[in-house]
Amino acid sequence: RQRSEYVLEVLGITDLEGIPAGGLSHGSARLVGLARALAAQPKYLIMDEPAAGLNEHEVPALLAALAKVREETGCGMLLVEHNVGLVAQACSRVVVLAAGSMIFDGDPQAALNDEGVKSAYLGDAAFGGGH
């Protein structure tokens, strides 16, 4: 019980306690799902697009919560995410895949400036070309 209360507090969703799942918004339901996973005190947490469906207030809260949990527990986190801004804020290491191959492994800021990453995801638009 104590761990559950801690996780709800860290995620900023103590007000959702006791609300039936069917009464939650999509974003709130995702945060409750994350809380459920964190309550189990995992060694590693794998998340597929954790910010999907969250509103503009929930995303910063999610980022702050993940940073706090990582700092306090040492829980390793793997995110599968297409939101480059979120990745740059939340991650200390980025692996970029394109067409089934790894094209980058390193610092998030370096990934944003990597010509191979730009080319793979922006095509000619990354270099001022295009039609």
Regions found by a protein language model. Give the residues of each.
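Glycine-rich phosphate-binding loops of nucleotide-dependent enzymes
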Residues: 1-131
